[in-house]
Design a protein with these regions (language model features):
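Small, basic N-terminal interaction modules of short regulatory proteins
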Residues: 1-68
């Protein structure tokens, strides 16, 4: 699992499976998009306006990448 925060876009992405694959985007809420693979497994979670939706400090204990 990889957690990436894009500060410029305030986007938090949680990759549950880092293998390259084709995915479909399934919007489940105004600010939450799931990446679903061909077998309907969730392989990623995208949270838009992340700083408003989650406490980003929770992820300090997780090894995450911060990008510009």
């Amino acid at each position: 699992m990889t957690v990436t925060y894009h500060e410029k876009h305030d986007l938090l992405y949680i990759s549950l499976d880092d293998r390259p694959r084709q995915v479909a985007n399934l919007r489940v809420d105004e600010d939450i998009v799931l990446d679903v693979d061909e077998q309907d497994r969730i392989v990623g979670i995208e949270i838009l306006d992340a700083s408003k939706r989650v406490d980003l400090d929770q992820f300090l204990t997780v090894d995450y990448r911060k990008t510009a």
